[in-house]
Amino acid sequence: MEDERLVPVSPRHAVLLSREYLTFVDTPPQRDYVVRTVAKRQVGAMMLMSGDLVIASADTRKSFPLAERYPLHFRKSYFPGQMHGETKDEFDNHARASTLIDIPPPIGHTPNTFRSCLLPGRPYSRLSPFFGVDPPTANIAEAEKLPLASAAGLWKLCEEAFSKLVTLQEGGLAHGDAELHNFIVCPTPLELILIDFEGSVSREAQTAEAWKKRCALDLEPLLREAVYLQCALGKQRGRFAELALERMPLLLKQPEQFHRAIELRGSVSG
């Protein structure tokens, strides 16, 4: 047996696995083999939710055809005591999103589990120099320190994220939790992928007013990031940039400080 091998984890992604894990890929274990726990929610010693990278068992592969194709994948498990939405709804909304914005499809679900493709990348929030900075006005100084190449790259990623969110909404689906950690930046191929559709809602299930509000809320994290990045780059063109400046008074306190920083950066750049 080879020491290492590329194993597909989605229609366009693969990861290099060592022999230790290839054994379970080639010979399905009796139970899902947990490679790593990447997220968990608990109260004291009581586990409520666990998000794990797993190698699918024989039964899992029989139950879900995509688990046979992508045995290494992400499994979210809910335990008694954890309130959660219907996993079938999450599966259906994820599948709908995959057709609207070309993301890897979901793998499967049971009443207490949800499975999706492993995405080899990092959350956008970990790439942003502005994430977690408080107060928000401190991001003006962070923006001034940001190299042009970094600011330009982050801007292009955010434009891509904005385009995908808008396409999703125009297709009748609102994400419901479009925080920056739910945008995964994958390097090979370089792309940004939206994850976690547990809180997604369809337009037909909302009143017109509720739908409008939900869509606006989904855009807020990206629009704030757009303001911060324009403090580094100066005023940009296009719907994304314009909407961020238009809604700035609703997004940030002391919007005049950000306006001034953007104008000054533009004059320096020019």
Task: Name each model feature, range by range.
Residues 23, 31-92:
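ATP-binding glycine-rich loop module of kinase domains
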Residues 102-157:
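Conserved structural core of kinase catalytic domains
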Residues 186, 191-270:
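C-lobe/activation-segment region of protein kinase-like
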